[in-house]
């Protein structure tokens, strides 16, 4: 099992390869989420971060989805709804030669980068807040679909989580 430091070293290499690919194909991206916070606050990664978060404009995201299989390394897999190999509303770039373990998930996992398309938002602040609240609920439900039953930091959390997992799988 890789240490968090080893995972971050591999992620850095993965990011450099992704950066080269994007420059060669005129795709503009930026770090987001915890990756952006880590780059600014820690001059690298947040100490516990085990993935990279990237965002692209919708046109660059669609370009990436279209050209990726033709020009990127074979030891990578791009998962997305558009490629019919993911249930998430964003892409995930997996490095197939580095498997990672997640004690809370049943999903097979490889080292990965999450790649999010960025679309415009309404001008009304209340609508924006509503969109983000819904997104958070949907994201949690998708995450629970792969979670392990009976696993949690305490018995009560594991019990509640098990009920939520069953609900999330029923809803879809």
Roles of regions detected by a PLM:
Residues 124-130:
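A short secondary-structure junction signal
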